[in-house]
Regions:
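Helix-loop-helix hairpin linking two adjacent transmembrane segments in secondary transporters
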Residues: 121-170
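Conserved MFS/SLC helix-loop-helix module at the cytosolic interface between two early adjacent transmembrane helices
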Residues: 42-78
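Cytoplasmic helix-loop-helix junction between adjacent transmembrane helices
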Residues: 86-126
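Extracytoplasmic
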Residues: 1-26, 47
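Small-residue-rich transmembrane alpha-helices and their cytosolic helix-loop interfaces
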Residues: 1, 33, 37, 64, ...
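Residue-level signature of mid-helix packing/kink "hotspots" within the transmembrane helices
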Residues: 9, 37-45, 129-130
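Helix-breaking motifs and short loop linkers at transmembrane-helix boundaries and internal kinks
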Residues: 23, 55, 76-82, 110
Length: 181
């Protein structure tokens, strides 16, 4: 959760520089900040349905890849249209998080430990913007806003390397369920 909040908040850190370089009006930068939620909110139930069908670890990995790549690609935008498309894609990718993460939590954490697990997960939502603003600001200061997005998106993708183990376990579980049926 911390990683998606770091990536999600990067746009606010970069907004003044981005607005200046891309010559966006205040209302256009407002669109850029809001459009993320146009995909994020309505797609959460869809992603929950999808996680129930093909597995939450797989859906989360796909969403994670989409939002990380969207973050990295934001460093390559050329104007309002490309920025809006990437923010929509990022919203779609991040819409996978809550349904998938909560499904995984319920499946893997005993009922007596779920409150702590949920609180620990939510801690990332609080800590992520703080870390993202600090680290993103330092990267922007030294290398510019474009580099900040590329670095943050690519750094987020490294999480998938560690998530592979979880994906293997979910595929094996699905295969054994299919054989048993």
């Amino acid at each position: 959760l911390m990683i998606n909040y770091i990536d999600r908040g990067a746009i606010a850190t970069a907004a003044p520089l981005l607005q200046d370089e891309l010559q966006l009006s205040p209302s256009e930068i407002g669109w850029v900040l809001a459009v993320f939620y146009w995909a994020y909110a309505p797609l959460q139930p869809v992603m929950g349905w999808l996680a129930d069908r093909i597995g939450p670890a797989i859906v989360l990995a796909a969403g994670f890849a989409l939002w990380s790549l969207s973050t990295a690609a934001t460093g390559l935008v050329w104007g309002l249209a490309s920025l809006v498309v990437l923010r929509l894609l990022m919203g779609a990718g991040e819409a996978t998080f809550y349904p998938s993460a909560l499904s995984l939590l319920v499946r893997n954490v005993p009922p007596t430990q779920r409150a702590l697990a949920t609180a620990t997960m939510q801690f990332g939502a609080v800590l992520g913007p703080d870390i993202g603003t600090l680290v993103g600001g330092m990267i922007m200061l030294h290398f510019g806003w474009r580099t900040m997005f590329v670095v943050m998106g690519c750094a987020s993708l490294t999480w998938l390397f560690f998530w592979r183990r979880r994906l293997r376990a979910e595929r094996e579980s699905q295969a054994s369920s299919a054989v048993a049926a």
